[in-house]
From Swiss-Prot:
Species: Lymnaea stagnalis (Great pond snail)
Subcellular location: Secreted
Tissues/organs with expression: Growth-controlling neurosecretory light green cells, in the cerebral ganglia of the CNS.
Protein name from the UniProt record: Schistosomin
Disulphide bridges: none
Length: 79
């Protein structure tokens, strides 16, 4: 995926089409499980995280069962 990212202080715009989708994201140094396509875009823009090509290795076996919470799915209104 590749996204247009807003500048700091600009509105973070994203139409959420799948709030329950789960993704294992990785930057080479960090791995995290997040929920929602908008959170995936946010993590790409803010932290350079991309969808892992080896999710079971990067996020651990059973990563798909990670519960969706505000901590791993919420996005700010302003970037």
């Amino acid at each position: 995926d590749n996204y247009w990212c807003p500048q700091s202080g600009e509105a973070f715009e994203c139409f959420e089409s799948d709030p329950n989708a789960k993704f294992c994201l990785n930057s080479g140094k960090t791995s995290v499980v997040i929920c929602s396509k908008c959170r995936k875009k946010y993590e790409f823009c803010r932290n350079g995280l991309k969808v892992s090509k080896r999710p079971d290795y990067d996020c651990g076996a059973g990563w798909e069962s990670t519960p969706c919470t505000g901590d791993n799915s919420a996005v700010p209104a302003v970037f």
